[in-house]
Design a protein with these regions (language model features):
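Flexible "cap/lid" loop of the alpha/beta hydrolase fold
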Residues: 157, 166-194
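Conserved alpha/beta-hydrolase "acid-adjacent" motif
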Residues: 269-274
Length: 318
């Protein structure tokens, strides 16, 4: 059985209503405590020192935020995203709940090196495993966004002993039946004349579809971190090739036994495929948030963060 909810956002907060019938080394306690605005929190996160560690054939650049004895949670970014694209409000909420948050750059992204191994979802999962082992983390909660959700699923299937719970945000089970990248996004990706910052701005209709939320927020850029790190066009294309050639997990999802939250914006292209994840992962939660797209964690941060923390609280090991 899965728990399915649709989240309706209004001026009074958010409410939860059934959407479908049920279907069978930085020891920093709270770096954000003295600031309130989104951009100032993003700036603090940017200014926290990065570290690097050798994992197999690459050096991975990462940041570890929170108490050293906090419960570890790993955040895995999507295609084209750098670790400074995570919403700092999410990270603040997690460390306030006594989590140790690890964010990192995937292979070839930002200051993480490219290495010699083939770009593939399996390899990205093994890179994440290697980071966990290098940091001496025996088990962690895993949050994967978009392509990061592919990596999280593969990690849970290849190394279930390392995964306490899964949060699959704006993603699918991939494979041949997966929806292709929208043509307008591919045009942006293949335009080598744009800077990474320009690409983010061009991605706005994908992150924030033209819904009532978008129309009501002419200041939408204030809801986005400004990326300082970069991803080159060749690396981005390699990420997309890894995603499109991945066989997916659709036929293996019943083997995922960890508590799982599937969360997606109703206006996201990934929304229809996300339900498949929840249907096939036993006992999973499925949350669909209205008036939200691929960037729902920016559009509705309070709802997103509360849902993530509520799920994590319910998924704690005894």
């Amino acid at each position: 059985m899965i728990l399915c909810f649709s989240i309706l956002i209004n001026n009074n907060g958010f409410s939860i209503s059934p959407a479908y019938s049920s279907v069978e080394q930085n020891n920093i306690s709270n770096p954000f405590s003295s600031t309130s605005s989104f951009q100032s929190k993003a700036s603090i996160l940017d200014n926290l020192p990065s570290q690097n560690i050798t994992v197999g054939d690459i050096n991975i650049v990462y940041k570890q935020i929170g108490k050293s004895d906090g419960k570890p949670i790993i955040l895995i970014t999507g295609a084209g995203a750098t670790m400074d694209m995570w919403n700092p409000l999410l990270i603040e909420n997690l460390i306030s709940a006594n989590y140790k948050v690890i964010i990192f750059e995937n292979r070839g992204v930002g200051q993480s090196t490219v290495g010699t191994k083939e770009f593939s979802i399996n390899q990205f999962a093994n890179d994440t495993l290697g980071l966990l082992d290098a940091l001496k983390i025996s088990k962690a909660d895993i949050l994967g966004w978009s392509l990061g959700g592919f990596i999280a699923q593969q990690l849970a299937l290849l190394h279930p002993e390392k995964v306490n719970s899964l949060i699959l945000y704006a993603t699918s089970c991939g494979g041949p039946s997966d929806r292709p990248t929208p043509p307008e996004i591919m045009q942006i990706i293949t335009n080598s004349s744009m800077s990474p910052q320009e690409r983010v701005q061009k991605d706005i209709p994908f992150l924030f579809p033209p819904t009532n939320w978008f129309k009501a927020h002419s200041d939408y850029l204030n809801y986005l971190p400004i990326p300082k790190e970069t991803i080159t066009q060749p690396i981005l294309l390699k990420q997309l090739e890894a995603a499109t050639t991945w066989k997916g997990t659709c036929n293996a999802l019943s083997n995922i036994t960890q508590p799982t939250l599937v969360i997606v914006g109703a206006d996201d292209d990934a929304a229809p495929d996300s339900l498949t994840l929840a249907e096939k992962i036993s006992g999973s939660w499925f949350i669909r948030i209205g008036t939200a797209g691929h960037g729902l964690m920016y559009q509705h941060p309070e709802a997103f963060n509360k849902l993530v923390l509520t799920f994590l609280e319910n998924s704690k090991e005894p």
